[in-house]
Amino acid sequence: MIKKTVIILLVGVLLFAQGIVYAAESLSLDSLIGEAKQNNPDILAAKKRWEASAARVPLSKSLEDPSIGFTFERIPRGTLKLNKTMPDDRMLTFSQFLPFFGKLSLKGKIAVVESQMFAAEHKAKELDIINQVKNAYYDLFMNDKEKELAQESLGLLEGVARVAEANYALGTISQEEVYKIHLEVARLNNALQNLEQEQSSKQTRLNTLLNRDPESSLGIPQLSEEASFEADIHSLDQSTVMNQPELLIFSYAIERNKHAKALAKRSFFPGLMASIVQRGITSGTLGPWDLMLSFSIPLWFWTKQKYEVKEAIANLGEAEAAYNAMQNRAFAEVKDLAVKAKIAKNKISLYKKNLIPMLENSIAASTAAFSSGKGDFMMLLDSQRMLVETKMNYYQALVEYNMNLADLERQVGGNLSEVKNEK
């Protein structure tokens, strides 16, 4: 009778442990990403730098401020009586410097390209923060699943401990085996405490990315294995060239240095200072006026303008080489992440379709055998432990897959769903 009660208790414990479900409010990743875009300080700071650079565009195309001067000529010696000068000797001068044709236009183009670089930096920061939010979300998901499986195992072992004590009373197992089970219970309790502390740290990390109170409560993250990844490598590379902010910044650097080279060549040409002088400004009628034109001559071009051009040419070459190097690194990273994502996807399929069902069937068979008095007690426990470990590996593969997709989206500069396969 006692043995039958022990068997029924063990079977009930196993079924209960496998059926634990924790209900809590789910945490939406999409809503977190939207909140980060709106509130993350790093994104907002990058946006303000972009806006500041856009404001510099009209400034770069503007003429220098003109100058206005007053001149009194032929003042009597030994006096400061300005009214003793002749009317035509009292003059108002207006002067304006005019750079050589095309210089202001090129400066404006350089400012526009620099503003585009800041726009790309803003996009890069946004993608980087989104990637950090996703990784923090996946870390929190993994922590939740580790807790769930640990609680499942703890519930099982606490029940098994009661069964073991009953079996020990019957004399069917040794006291050493009972001690081992209690040690395992203690280990799992300690692991759960550590996971609780880690959860607090991971929640703080996510809250700070959202610019929330670090101690704000969060729901339970959900992760679907339905995330698709079908794009071919060539399509991913094309998307990287078109959309990756870092590559765009290097591309804009090439364009900026081309304009800088053209501007340096124009430094060989003179600028014009135009002055208009109006005489008789204090008399009843205005007197004659004068026009004065002066030119800035690049007389020392062999030590100045010549090297401005050489510098611009070198900067252009450096920008082109840096772009090629960056592109090669990006292509290699895209390939690596795509392969890792496919490997993780294969692991998910292996665990879900093969290993987990096989272990569940094994536990069902072991439970039935033990209930009939033919099974081995420790073998049943080992099967349950293997199932928990396999589920853990499944969740790790799921997180790894989604993290690889997140890193891949960071590399290509946008959502993978927007990448079109080459036909």
Q: Where in the sequence are the language-model features?
A:
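Bacterial N-terminal signal peptides that target proteins for export
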Residues: 1-9
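Periplasmic alpha-helical coiled-coil/stalk elements that build and connect Gram-negative outer-membrane
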Residues: 2, 125-241, 337-340, 344
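Bacterial N-terminal signal peptides
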Residues: 8-17
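Bacterial Sec-pathway N-terminal export signals of envelope proteins
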Residues: 21-72, 97-100, 214-258, 299, ...
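Acidic, low-complexity, intrinsically disordered peripheral segments
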Residues: 22, 30, 393-423
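Hydrophobic/aromatic residues within transmembrane alpha-helices of membrane transport systems
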Residues: 36, 46, 94, 140, ...
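Amphipathic alpha-helical coiled-coil segments
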Residues: 45-60, 125, 129-150, 159, ...
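Small/polar-residue-enriched beta-strand and adjacent coil segments characteristic
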Residues: 66-124, 248-260, 265-327, 337
